[in-house]
UniProtKB/Swiss-Prot annotation:
Transmembrane segments: none annotated. The gene is E4. The major E4 form is first synthesized as an E1^E4 fusion protein from spliced E1^E4 transcripts, such that the first few amino acids of the E4 protein are derived from the N terminus of E1. Assembles into oligomeric complexes. Interacts with host CDK1. Interacts with host SRPK1; this interaction may favor expression of late viral transcripts. Interacts with host cytokeratin components KRT8 and KRT18. Belongs to the papillomaviridae E4 protein family. It is found in: Host cytoplasm; Host nucleus. Contributes to multiple aspects of the viral life cycle including viral genome amplification, suppression of suprabasal cell differentiation and egress of newly formed virions. Induces host cell cycle arrest at the G2 phase by associating with and preventing the nuclear entry of host CDK1/cyclin B1 complexes. Inhibits cellular DNA replication by preventing loading of host replication licensing proteins MCM2 and MCM7 onto chromatin. Within the cytoplasm, associates with host kinase SRPK1, a splicing factor regulator, and inhibits its activity. Residues 1-48, 83-114 are annotated as: Disordered. This is Protein E4.
Length: 114
């Protein structure tokens, strides 16, 4: 009779003790070597970028992802050249144009004699 009760308990499998044992078997406390061997090797960031997934979005730097000259853009608008103060390409040349109209250029021999 005692054997019948034990058999019925093991067949049902509803013991909390059995449930804990199966959960512990499924979740190892330390990573096993078989898990490391079965996992695919991590992709190199350049490979992730070429496919377009992963931590790297693309090969383009993030400063180019927003429109130029936008409110929080890292890049100035395309018309702003160096030394123009954001006024355009011709703004930096106004001094040189004024010298040309006055006849004083840096490569002119007259500029040195006047």
């Amino acid at each position: 009779m005692a054997n019948d009760k034990e058999i019925a308990q093991t067949e049902s499998g509803s013991h909390p003790k059995d449930l804990k044992e199966t959960l512990q078997e499924k979740k190892p406390s330390q990573p096993s070597l078989s898990l490391l061997c079965s996992a695919p090797p991590p992709a190199v960031p350049s490979e992730q970028a070429s496919v377009g997934y992963g931590t790297v979005l693309a090969r383009t730097p993030t400063i180019f992802l927003q429109a130029r000259g936008a409110l929080f853009s890292a890049l100035p608008p395309p018309r702003a050249g160096h030394g123009t103060g954001g006024l355009g390409i011709k703004a930096g040349r106004r001094g040189a144009v004024a010298r040309l109209h006055r006849g004083r250029t840096s490569d002119s021999p007259k500029a040195h004699h006047q």
